[in-house]
């Protein structure tokens, strides 16, 4: 049974959960099953972690506390389907640290089966989550019926609370610390290695601090302070809000001991996942006892203290409140050496901790608590991880997001010592290597501008990571600790790419990860920080490109912080305005909307931009997943990267958003993501069946294709193409296949499909040309009269469609759907244009062209004389030419077995993407790309079940994920003799009057181009 607690003082000390396995000691009498040997036992209100009481155990040397009852230990699932393990969970309070340990022993009928030691050299609360079968000595047995706690060879007193004899928990997350350093010893998860990394030693020598270095330390401290704090005033309203929030925690002192409402990290609730019905992972947050709000209040108090007048009553009040909260949270176990049993993803919970302590550095010094506070910050920021020289480029995006601020705060908290200098040198080196292009699917930044998390390009995580990266690049800029030019330029390129694929600020739907809600955006402040960090080579005080990009982006960022998703960094509008003013005063002006073409090999993404519109294609492959689904996140977005093409647009002069582009969540048919060729399923069948498939992953679904060919080519950064072999995973409709291509030529996008097939006889297969929300009167009036016939269609947003194949128009007023996160029913008015391939199609195909930002007259003329002609459209290749643009675009799915149509390009020796542009009678621009990232070669690394079906496996289990992209030679044969300036990636194999043979060395899914001259 769960006893819920609500956000009011009367309930904040209620016992969290009652269960026969849980001991919280809230009854006045000792439980009958608990006895002691050479011990005094009692119920105490002096210290408590759950409810208002704990068990007080005063022991003589080698005394024992015994609990006799069925411990409810369960063995791990022998079938391997359930990966959870039985864990013992306990909180211990110690008033007097002892360099000793107590021993927990688990017995069956008096015979010891398993045990573990717990160090007691601490003051305050500490926790242990210890898995019986993995972490303990001995062999646990079902039916164990006694817990014995054995004291060390010394007197002492401990308080015990929130003891759970056994409960099944996710076995990945238990955390070692100073008390239980042996727990989960094999983990390399970066959230869980606090203890291991606390032992790391520096490889940079200690040196005296020079005068210049001392000045730089002051500069760093000032820059950091300005970054996290903007001077303001403390209003009476703000002071009153702080008082009310502070009073909720009921912090009091008695006999020199602090007490108050128990505080937990959000993940502590995972102890109850298998104990209570309707378990809610966020229950502790809802109960008001989670530490994120606590640290946010500490930061708020620190800001109020800094904003108030010296010697004023409110300043003294804020100081008292801050110190009381500091004492209480330290007592609660937020201290050096403590990991609360389960600490995964704690970065978000302690985000406010670091700036709060840093802003009160002087107060903590005055109170003699600075050293303790420093150590606390260094422990949770895992600052010692920066000591060894990085072995390779890149770090996890979460480290940038949640650890950079903590690490630099923990270092800048220190006095100006040689140790501080050593930390600063180590830290700047760590940031430098972290910002460099990472190999394979490793985090965080890619050579092409991709920003990686969860082994894919993931803007929603990148905005948090870029917050850390850009802040640190600025912090160290123009000092002896500045990052390298490569690191600086890599992050700059990531931001330039992001402002290209976002329009104006919003992520494309297909690039929204598990948040396809239209709310994710880039953060203009990142561009501001890079603008004032100067040029990558360190020569310029400002970066012109970043300044111009920032001034364009910030002008339209009128969204309120309240509307922003939780993962978006919080930004001060005052700071935005201040930097914008500074840049304008220095002569910088906003850039125009970016134009051209971008291909992200590490995102399976192609983007074409003209005027204010963008077209974003996304696919997936054997390297890059199609969609990320969690329980309660992205339930229906299976087809997001099945060759989708989203047009983001707005009337001239308006800011482009999902809404101006005809998208909203209400009523959106998740089957009909524009551009996608998919089986149109009932939403119950489309809903992700989220599983925990292996020990490398949690409850999540990220499905892969077994095809390596998926990605784009970009020619001269102005035009391009995109192709993919679509093969759906066997988890759902594994017989579904298609060959899809997009050809981006100036303001025209030609969309081709062939070889569409599956054996699903229950539901039709469709290619969606558009699906648009109809949200206002003008749009309703527009569609009343229909907006197309035959081959020509115009939507109400100014986009034209040329469709030379039979298509079906649907007007669904209303159309019913479901929310991506809750599954709750929604409705809206929508129009769709689709190509129906029928049920279980064989050799299906389609052809259409899109012209955004056009008019009916132009479209009518286009239909009479299309600006392109298709030369080949089959399983082997999609090839077209645009005579007016003098471009021929090749998507070669298979190695050509005969001469290719189109003139210049005769053969290639492998599948690839090619674009040829005739620049003059004697000059040609040739671009070649191999979309296969080649992280491994040969057949796809699938595992098959007994029926020969591809099994679902997590990306994290694959051994090749951190491999460098391999080089793939692509040999092209051109008609006639051509002169080529050789490059490291392009060599002439042979040439004569009849033909010229070139060999390109392709990697990273990148585009390589050369100029050919007669």
Curated annotation (Swiss-Prot):
Broad-specificity glycosaminoglycan lyase, which acts in an exolytic fashion degrading chondroitin sulfates and dermatan sulfate to yield only disaccharide products. Has a preference for chondroitin 4-sulfate over chondroitin 6-sulfate. Has extremely low activity against hyaluronic acid. Is not active against acharan sulfate, heparin or heparan sulfate. It comes from Bacteroides thetaiotaomicron (strain ATCC 29148 / DSM 2079 / JCM 5827 / CCUG 10774 / NCTC 10582 / VPI-5482 / E50). Ca(2+) binds at residues 24, 26, 50, 53, 161. Pfam families: Lyase_8, Lyase_catalyt, Lyase_N. Residues 1-14 form the signal peptide. InterPro entries: Chondroitin_ABC_lyase, Chondroitin_lyas, Chondroitinase_ABC_I, Gal_mutarotase_sf_dom, Galactose-bd-like_sf, GH-type_carb-bd, Lyase_8-like_C, Lyase_8_central_dom. It catalyses: Exolytic removal of Delta(4)-unsaturated disaccharide residues from the non-reducing ends of both polymeric chondroitin/dermatan sulfates and their oligosaccharide fragments. This is Chondroitin sulfate ABC exolyase.
């Amino acid at each position: 049974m769960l006893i819920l607690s609500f956000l009011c003082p009367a309930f904040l000390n209620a016992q969290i959960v009652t269960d026969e396995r849980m001991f919280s000691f809230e009854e006045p009498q000792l439980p009958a099953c608990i006895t002691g040997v050479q011990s005094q036992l009692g119920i105490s209100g002096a210290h408590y972690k759950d409810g208002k009481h704990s068990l007080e155990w005063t022991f003589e040397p080698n005394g024992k506390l015994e609990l006799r009852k069925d411990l409810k230990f369960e063995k791990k699932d022998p079938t391997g389907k359930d990966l959870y393990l039985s864990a013992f969970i306990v909180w211990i309070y110690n008033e007097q640290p002892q360099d000793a340990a107590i021993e927990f022993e688990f017995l069956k009928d008096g015979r010891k089966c398993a045990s573990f030691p717990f160090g007691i050299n601490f003051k305050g609360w500490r926790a242990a989550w210890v898995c019986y079968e993995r972490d303990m000595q001995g062999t646990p047995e079902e039916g164990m019926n006694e817990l014995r706690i054995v004291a060390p060879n010394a007197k002492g007193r401990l308080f015990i609370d929130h003891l759970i004899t056994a409960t099944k928990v996710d076995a990945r997350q238990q955390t070692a610390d100073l008390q239980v350093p042996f727990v989960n010893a094999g983990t390399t998860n970066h959230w869980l290695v606090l203890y291991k990394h606390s032992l790391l030693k520096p490889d940079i020598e200690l040196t005296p601090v020079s005068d210049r270095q001392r000045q730089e330390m002051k500069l760093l401290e000032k820059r950091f302070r300005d970054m996290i704090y903007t001077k303001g005033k403390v209003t009476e309203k703000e002071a009153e809000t702080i008082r009310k929030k502070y009073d909720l925690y009921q912090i009091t002192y008695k006999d020199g001991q602090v007490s108050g409402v128990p505080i937990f990290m959000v993940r502590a609730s995972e102890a109850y996942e298998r104990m209570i019905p309707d378990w809610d992972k966020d229950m502790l947050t809802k109960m008001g006892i989670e530490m994120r709000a606590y640290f946010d209040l500490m930061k708020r108090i620190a800001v109020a203290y800094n904003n108030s007048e010296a010697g004023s009553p409110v300043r003294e009040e804020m100081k008292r409140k801050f110190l009381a909260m500091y004492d209480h949270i330290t007592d609660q176990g937020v201290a050096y050496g403590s990991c609360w049993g389960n600490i995964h993803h704690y970065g978000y919970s302690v985000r406010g901790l670091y700036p709060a302590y840093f802003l009160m550095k002087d107060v903590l010094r005055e109170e003699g608590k600075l050293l303790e506070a420093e150590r606390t910050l260094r422990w949770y920021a895992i600052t010692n991880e920066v000591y060894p020289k990085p072995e390779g480029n890149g770090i996890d995006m979460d480290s940038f997001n949640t650890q950079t601020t903590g690490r630099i705060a923990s270092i800048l908290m220190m006095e100006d010592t040689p140790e501080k200098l050593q930390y600063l040198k180590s830290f700047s080196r760590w940031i430098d290597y972290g910002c460099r292009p990472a190999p394979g699917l490793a985090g965080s930044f890619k050579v092409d501008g991709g920003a990686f998390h969860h082994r894919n390009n993931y803007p929603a995580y990148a905005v948090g990571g870029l917050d850390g990266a850009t802040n640190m690049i600025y912090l160290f800029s123009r000092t002896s600790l500045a990052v390298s030019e490569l690191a600086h330029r890599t992050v700059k390129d990531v931001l330039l790419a992001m402002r290209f694929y976002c329009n104006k600020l919003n992520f494309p739907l297909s690039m929204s990860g598990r948040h396809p809600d239209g709310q994710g955006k880039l953060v203009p402040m990142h561009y501001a920080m890079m603008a004032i960090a100067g040029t990558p080579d360190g020569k310029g005080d400002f970066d012109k490109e970043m300044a111009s990009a920032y001034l364009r982006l910030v002008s339209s960022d009128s969204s309120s912080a309240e509307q922003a998703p939780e993962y978006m960094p919080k930004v001060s509008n005052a700071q935005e305005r201040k930097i914008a003013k500074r840049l304008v005063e220095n002569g910088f002006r906003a850039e125009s909307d970016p134009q051209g073409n971008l291909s992200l090999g590490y995102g399976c993404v192609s983007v074409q931009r003209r005027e204010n519109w963008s077209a974003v294609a996304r696919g997936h492959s054997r390297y890059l997943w199609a969609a990320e689904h969690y329980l309660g996140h992205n339930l229906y977005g299976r087809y997001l990267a099945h060759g989708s093409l989203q047009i983001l647009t707005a009337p001239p002069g308006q800011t482009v958003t999902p809404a101006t582009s005809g998208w909203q969540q209400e009523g959106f048919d998740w089957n009909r993501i524009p551009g996608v060729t998919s089986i149109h399923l009932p939403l119950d069948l489309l809903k992700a069946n989220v599983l925990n498939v292996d020990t490398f992953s949690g409850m999540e679904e990220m499905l892969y294709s077994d095809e390596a060919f998926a990605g784009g080519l970009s020619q001269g950064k102005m035009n391009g193409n995109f192709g993919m072999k679509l093969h759906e995973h066997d988890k759902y409709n594994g017989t579904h296949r298609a060959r899809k291509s997009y050809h981006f030529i100036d303001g025209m996008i030609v969309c081709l499909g062939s070889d569409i097939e599956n054996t699903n006889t229950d539901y039709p297969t469709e290619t969606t040309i558009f699906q648009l929300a109809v949200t206002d009167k003008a749009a309703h009036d527009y569609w009343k009269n229909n907006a197309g016939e035959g081959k020509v269609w115009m939507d109400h947003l100014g986009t034209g469609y040329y469709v030379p194949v039979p298509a079906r128009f649907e007007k669904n007023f209303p159309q019913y759907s479901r929310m991506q996160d809750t599954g709750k029913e929604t409705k809206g008015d929508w129009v769709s244009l689709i190509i129906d391939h029928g049920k279980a199609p064989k050799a299906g195909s389609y052809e259409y062209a899109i012209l955004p930002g056009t008019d009916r007259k132009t479209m009518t003329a286009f239909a009479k004389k299309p600006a392109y002609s298709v030369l080949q459209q089959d399983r082997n290749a999609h090839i077209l030419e645009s005579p007016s643009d003098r471009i021929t675009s090749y998507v070669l799915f298979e190695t050509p077995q005969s001469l290719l149509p189109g003139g210049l390009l005769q053969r290639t020796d492998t599948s690839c993407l090619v674009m040829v542009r005739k620049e003059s009678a004697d000059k040609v621009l040739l671009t070649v790309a191999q979309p296969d990232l080649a992280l491994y070669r040969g057949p796809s690394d699938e595992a098959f079940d007994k029926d020969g079906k591809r099994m679902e496996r997590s990306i994290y289990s694959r051994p090749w994920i951190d491999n460098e992209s391999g080089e793939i030679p692509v040999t092209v044969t051109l008609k006639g003799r051509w002169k080529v300036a050789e490059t490291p990636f392009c060599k002439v194999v042979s040439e004569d009057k009849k033909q010229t043979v070139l060999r390109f060395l392709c990697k990273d899914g990148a585009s390589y181009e050369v100029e050919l001259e007669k």
